[in-house]
Amino acid sequence: MYIIIMGAGRIGTLVARMLESEGHDVAIIEMNRERAREISEYVSGLVIEGDATDQKVLENANIKNADAFAALTGRDDANILACILAKHLNPKIMTILRITDPGKKKIFEEVKELKRYFDIVVSPEDIAANYIFRTLVTPGFDRVLLPREGAEIIQFQVNEDCEVAGKPIKELNLPKDSLIIAVYDEKGNLVIPSGDTVIPKKGQVIIFAKNSALQDVKKIMEKKREE
């Protein structure tokens, strides 16, 4: 994919480097001259000094042939305008809008007249706050938040002391709003599990669970074997 990123701040830079590491072509548009020069040393793609709300700048970035455009600056108004302009120049492009005010996020997701300009709306601040909250409320495991679904993908380390070790999944009595989606043994071999899959005595278990089921899942997966 060819992706254009607006903004070379911490988020924009991190996203660009992650995309490049996966083999995608990336261009970054940054207004600040010093920052544009600095970021060019860290990414292999095109870095353009300019304003992404300017049509000529987007055209110089080859917007008409881009697969996606991500407006990731800390300025909501500029991000909004740039996404609208990107859609105007390339109606098939996927747009990702960063909103710093979580309160505005629902407006862009629910108002039909706005949704056609913004394919994905993200609020890093909202995600970070959610992550901190969930970690405080249910600490103790690695997680990936899925705010829209009200769920998380969580990872548990398993060893011989865990009560679940050596048991088939169908005997774990996990809550109905949870599902084991992957099991790794000690050597890192992946198993897509069924009910008969046995939890290894040492390894990792990946579980998809709704927030309402997290506490029960945690109790089951972290319970120690009685001596």
UniProtKB/Swiss-Prot annotation:
<feature type="domain" description="RCK N-terminal">
    <location>
        <begin position="1"/>
        <end position="122"/>
    </location>
</feature>
<feature type="binding site" description="in other chain">
    <location>
        <begin position="7"/>
        <end position="11"/>
    </location>
    <ligand>
        <name>NAD(+)</name>
    </ligand>
</feature>
<feature type="domain" description="RCK C-terminal">
    <location>
        <begin position="141"/>
        <end position="223"/>
    </location>
</feature>
<dbReference type="Pfam" id="PF02080">
    <property type="entry name" value="TrkA_C"/>
</dbReference>
<feature type="binding site" description="in other chain">
    <location>
        <begin position="73"/>
        <end position="74"/>
    </location>
    <ligand>
        <name>NAD(+)</name>
    </ligand>
</feature>
<dbReference type="InterPro" id="IPR036721">
    <property type="entry name" value="RCK_C_sf"/>
</dbReference>
<dbReference type="InterPro" id="IPR050721">
    <property type="entry name" value="Trk_Ktr_HKT_K-transport"/>
</dbReference>
<keyword id="KW-0813">Transport</keyword>
<keyword id="KW-0520">NAD</keyword>
<feature type="binding site">
    <location>
        <position position="98"/>
    </location>
    <ligand>
        <name>NAD(+)</name>
    </ligand>
</feature>
<keyword id="KW-0406">Ion transport</keyword>
<dbReference type="InterPro" id="IPR006037">
    <property type="entry name" value="RCK_C"/>
</dbReference>
<comment type="function">
    <text>Part of a potassium transport system.</text>
</comment>
<keyword id="KW-0633">Potassium transport</keyword>
<feature type="binding site" description="in other chain">
    <location>
        <position position="51"/>
    </location>
    <ligand>
        <name>NAD(+)</name>
    </ligand>
</feature>
<protein>
    <recommendedName>
        <fullName>Trk system potassium uptake protein TrkA homolog</fullName>
    </recommendedName>
</protein>
<dbReference type="GO" id="GO:0015079">
    <property type="term" value="F:potassium ion transmembrane transporter activity"/>
</dbReference>
<dbReference type="Pfam" id="PF02254">
    <property type="entry name" value="TrkA_N"/>
</dbReference>
<dbReference type="GO" id="GO:0005886">
    <property type="term" value="C:plasma membrane"/>
</dbReference>
<feature type="binding site" description="in other chain">
    <location>
        <position position="30"/>
    </location>
    <ligand>
        <name>NAD(+)</name>
    </ligand>
</feature>
<dbReference type="InterPro" id="IPR036291">
    <property type="entry name" value="NAD(P)-bd_dom_sf"/>
</dbReference>
<dbReference type="InterPro" id="IPR003148">
    <property type="entry name" value="RCK_N"/>
</dbReference>
<keyword id="KW-0630">Potassium</keyword>
<dbReference type="InterPro" id="IPR006036">
    <property type="entry name" value="K_uptake_TrkA"/>
</dbReference>
